[in-house]
């Protein structure tokens, strides 16, 4: 494992954390709220983002425009089945979703999930560091100074990515608190 490959893995953890937390409902309409919803169409299961365009019509409303108007009712059923506490409104060939303001109880629950997910991401980052350091110590071709230098660099990367995860979590928490 090289320093570059360790950094690439850390970027992957950060990206995964961002995708996971994007789906948290903060009270503002965002396509990520529903894009991963699965819908039964054409005899198969597909992601909503693959069968409809998802746009934000205003701060609290999503507009879904299916590529095939015949899938409107399946989209509505898929959203209801996803248990997202969202009510789809079918309007001809489109589906509107009003995003309700989250309750205090929901906000507390999401903040708990957010803290758990951020801790999991930081643990994953630290595990990458540990794996890198273990491989360094087993490499007989490196001098002691080179090992120390690389350990310092991987620690700097670890600190950088853990800080980014904390900042993203704080932003999401602030978003939840201000709605």
From Swiss-Prot:
One of its GO terms (cellular component) is cytoplasm. Signal peptide: none annotated. GO terms for molecular function: ribosomal large subunit binding. GO terms for biological process: translation; translational termination. InterPro entries: Ribosome_recyc_fac, Ribosome_recyc_fac_dom, RRF_sf. It comes from the Bacteria. It is found in: Cytoplasm. This is Ribosome-recycling factor. The gene is frr.
